[in-house]
C-alpha cells in the first residue's frame, strides 16, 4: 500500500488543506451562516460569526481528516479517491491523526470560549457521529449508511442557530430535516455513477446491494419528499413568498433530474444529478437568507 511509504513522499501544506475537504466544509459553513441569521431578528455580530465559522470549520476539517485516515485503504482502490493525501502516501497515518486531533481541539476550544457550550457540545457530537459512527462503522455495515449517517451531516444549520440563541428551537430542526432528506438522493446519485468503484471496494452502497434501478426509484421518492419538506419553512411562517417560489423552482428542477435519471441508462446523468443537488442545497439556503431580510 502507498500509505506504508508516506515518509518517502514530500508533504505539502496543500495536502493538509485537502484533508479538510474544503469544498464540502464551505458548503456546510454556508448552512451554518444561514442558521445564524435565521435565528436572529436583526444582524449577527461579525465577531460571533467569525468565531462560530472558525470553530465549526476546524471541527469539520478534523472529522474530514479522520475520514481520510479511516478510509485510506478504500480510497486507494477507488479512482475518485486514490490520490488523496493519506491513501496516496503523501501524509502518514500519524501525521493525519495528529492534525485531526489538533485542529479538532482548537475548534472546540474556540466554540467553548467565544460562542457557547451548547454549540461546542453539539459540534463534538456531530464530529463523533460523522468520524466515528458513520465513517468507522455505518459506511461498511449497511446500505442505509447514508440515511442514518445523514443526521451528522445535517447538523450545521442547527449549530449556527444555537450559536446565536444558545438553545434548541423547533425551527432549527426544520433546517436539519431539509438537509437530512436531501442527503440520500445526493449521495446515491454519485454512488450510481461510481457503482463499479464502490463494488470493488466492497462498500455496501444501495446500488451495490439492491441494484441501480432500485436506487433510482429511491432517489425519485426522496426527491419528492424533499420537495414537500422544503416547503415546511413557509408552512410554519418561518419564511415568506421569496423562499416559497425559490423552493418550488429548485424542487421541481431537482425532480426533473430525478425523473430523467430514472428513465435513462446513461451514467453521466447520475453525475449531473449529483452536481445539481449541490447547487440545489446552496441556492435553497441562499433563498432562505434573502427571504429573511427582504
Curated annotation (Swiss-Prot):
It is found in: Cell inner membrane. The keyword Nucleotide-binding does not apply. Keywords: Cell inner membrane, Cell membrane, Heme biosynthesis, Membrane, Transferase, Transmembrane, Transmembrane helix. One of its GO terms (cellular component) is plasma membrane. GO terms for molecular function: protoheme IX farnesyltransferase activity. It comes from the Bacteria. InterPro entries: Protohaem_IX_farnesylTrfase (IPR006369), UbiA_prenyltransferase (IPR000537), UbiA_prenylTrfase_CS (IPR030470), UbiA_sf (IPR044878). Its main location: membrane. The chain crosses the membrane at residues 24-44, 48-68, 96-116, 118-138, 145-165, 172-192, 224-244, 245-265, 268-288. GO terms for biological process: heme O biosynthetic process. Its EC number is 2.5.1.141. It catalyses: heme b + (2E,6E)-farnesyl diphosphate + H2O = Fe(II)-heme o + diphosphate. Signal peptide: none annotated. It is an enzyme of class 2 (transferase). Carbon 2 of the heme B porphyrin ring is defined according to the Fischer nomenclature. PANTHER family: 4-HYDROXYBENZOATE SOLANESYLTRANSFERASE (PTHR43448:SF7), PROTOHEME IX FARNESYLTRANSFERASE, MITOCHONDRIAL (PTHR43448). This is Protoheme IX farnesyltransferase. It comes from Legionella pneumophila subsp. pneumophila (strain Philadelphia 1 / ATCC 33152 / DSM 7513). The lineage of its organism: Bacteria, Pseudomonadati, Pseudomonadota, Gammaproteobacteria, Legionellales.
